[in-house]
Amino acid sequence: MPRLLGWNGARIQGRVRELLNIFQLDPGAYAAKFPHQLSGGQQQRVGVARAFAAEPAVLLMDEPFGALDPIIRAKAQDDLRDIQRRFGTTIVLVTHDIDEAFRLGDRVAVMSQGRVLQYDRPAALLICPSDPFISRLTGTGDRAMKLLSLTTAGEAAEAGPAEGATVPASATLRDVLSDLLWSGAAVVTVIDAAGTPCGRLTLAGILAHGRPR
């Protein structure tokens, strides 16, 4: 695509190196490799990198992670989210996995039989579904856990003294709750990317985030 847009060789090579570095693939080791020489996860990262090669303003992705195992899939989803935030690209992603839609989407459009039933933020789809189909799709048995997965520890951190184990600010409240239940603790300290405490979370505070407001 960059060649079709008239990019010169130097610009193309620079973009290739930039994207490989962003996706944690050393250009010296991977730039000349063929797809069959890469692992499944590496192939997926290269595929996403190629989609960003021409600096598109809007990117359409149809079930991009459906064939990956859960661990590689989660990493690929995290990579896509980080890259989207870095470049500011608008991504329209089609998926049949509501958890994936909630994990990646700022807004989610739920469609059935060719009609858009609701277009809203993930939390609104959980708390105020406009149609019985959406209620069935989002599930009723684990709504609280889905709601907790939409908020990070950094977003929910409360002021207070550092106490207990530490959790990264990027962790979801669902993950933090799981850790607290497993350890039997009632409070954890939230740390930023540099390892600096930026607040704390209590079990009671997390549970409050799992209820509609």
Per-region residue spans from a language model:
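Conserved catalytic motifs of ABC-family nucleotide-binding domains
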Residues: 55
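The conserved cystathionine-beta-synthase
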Residues: 162-194, 202-213
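Conserved ABC ATPase "signature" region
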Residues: 10-29
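ABC ATPase "signature
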Residues: 119-120, 128, 200
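Catalytic Walker B motif of ABC-type/P-loop ATPase nucleotide-binding domains
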Residues: 59-62
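Hydrophobic anchor residue at the start of the ABC signature
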Residues: 48
